[in-house]
UniProtKB/Swiss-Prot annotation:
NCBIfam families: prfB. Belongs to the prokaryotic/mitochondrial release factor family. The modification N5-methylglutamine is found at residue 254. This is Peptide chain release factor 2. PANTHER family: CLASS I PEPTIDE CHAIN RELEASE FACTOR, PEPTIDE CHAIN RELEASE FACTOR 2. The lineage of its organism: Bacteria, Bacillati, Actinomycetota, Actinomycetes, Micrococcales. One of its GO terms (cellular component) is cytoplasm. Peptide chain release factor 2 directs the termination of translation in response to the peptide chain termination codons UGA and UAA. Methylated by PrmC. Methylation increases the termination efficiency of RF2. PROSITE patterns: RF_PROK_I.
Length: 374
């Protein structure tokens, strides 16, 4: 490409192409196409669905591979088109074309950044869907309110990305907010993406529940686990589980159901407890609770086999220790990740789901730590 009058845009475009080329080498489009061909052939076998678990595994892998290749090919076309647009701006000294190219350049940089982060999601479970549990910690009613704020933040984040979610369980506090909430994010790489959110979150603000208007510090814990697939072999003997049924409850402990549709499963050997109440029937709640319990037990099993996986669930005590992010609303406004040092002053935006930069920084921080440990 000849020299042009817009050197800043040209340098940015060259850097963009270099970044893309490095990502393409990591993802390896040719290898992806071969995988897709093999998986497509397997998916076309007439008796595949005689084994539903194997069929789900094949179709899930095929969908993930096709999605990754589609993103790569779309970016290829967009970068090629941008290069043509920049050449047009150069040859005709067209400022309108330059403005259009500059806008597309910014959009492409963001798309490339997102794809680059995907290349860092290479953990055993990173491609899985995720189950997220938020629990209020120290701080009384403010902590319960904070837990509800975090639930909204993550649901808004998923909505921004078009990721389907399902709230599986909510346990309301007496005065306001939530004791705990569990929801599922049904998207590829949801676990790898959200697992960096696991840990203790801290809120500092003037309490709306304090008549004297004092500043209050409160905490909530976020746990993230990969959702089990039918191909994972986790058999739980019936005598290892205690089943309790009760009526679903709403804010303030008010019953929202006239039947005992809510289900609590307790895995006696490990003490793991899972409650579900948001489905319409006891049968549906039990099925959802069983799947989440299996997911937690699978993760526990893997953690026992490999001590390095202890950090996967991020099941921590929500108090002063082990904090990963602070949300300060008073006396100043700042959200800061204590691991990556990433911080922003737009607290309302963050609490409305604008957390991509925090997640990206967390994934890069985790990848750097893994590389340093190797």
């Amino acid at each position: 490409m000849a020299d042009i009058d817009f050197p800043a845009e040209l340098r940015a475009l060259r850097a963009l192409r270099a970044t893309y080329d490095s990502i393409e080498r990591v993802i390896d489009a040719d290898s992806l196409r071969k995988d897709i061909a093999v998986l497509s052939e397997q998916a076309g076998v007439p008796d595949l669905w005689d084994n539903p678990a194997e069929a789900q595994k094949v179709t899930s892998k095929l969908s993930h591979a096709q999605s990754k290749l589609e993103r790569l090919e779309t970016l290829t076309a967009r970068i090629d088109d941008l290069e043509v647009l920049v050449e047009l701006a150069e040859s005709e000294h067209d400022e309108d074309s330059l403005a259009e190219a500059s806008k597309e350049l910014v959009s492409l940089q963001k798309s490339l950044q997102e794809l680059e982060v995907v290349t860092l999601l290479a953990g055993e479970y990173d491609e899985r869907e995720a189950v997220v549990t938020i629990r209020s910690g120290a701080g009384g009613v403010d902590a319960a309110d904070f837990a509800e704020m975090l639930l909204r933040m993550y649901l808004r984040w998923a909505e921004r990305h078009g990721y389907p979610t399902s709230v599986l369980d909510t346990s309301y506090a007496e005065e306001a907010g939530l004791k705990s909430a569990t929801f599922e994010v049904k998207a590829p790489y949801a676990f790898g993406t959200l697992s960096v959110e696991a840990g203790t979150h801290r809120l500092v603000r003037i309490s709306p529940f304090d008549n004297q208007g004092r500043r209050q510090t409160s905490f909530a814990a976020v746990e993230v686990i990969p959702l089990i697939e039918q191909t994972d072999s986790i058999e739980i003997p019936d005598n290892d589980i205690r089943v309790d049924v009760f009526r679903s409850s709403g804010p303030g402990g008010q019953s929202v159901n006239t039947t005992d549709s809510a289900v609590r499963l307790t895995h006696l050997p490990t003490g793991t407890v899972v409650s579900m109440q948001n489905e319409k029937s006891q049968l549906q709640n039990r099925a959802a609770a069983t799947r989440v319990l299996q997911s937690r037990l699978l993760l526990l099993k893997k953690q026992q086999e490999d001590a390095e996986k202890k950090a996967l669930a991020g099941d921590v005590k929500a108090s002063w220790g082990d904090q990963m992010r602070s949300y300060v609303l008073n006396p100043y406004q700042m959200v800061k990740d204590l691991r990556t040092e990433h911080e922003v002053g737009n607290t309302s935006g963050v609490l409305d789901g604008d957390i991509d930069d925090f997640i990206d920084a967390g994934i890069r921080w985790r990848a750097n730590n893994r590389n340093a440990a190797e």
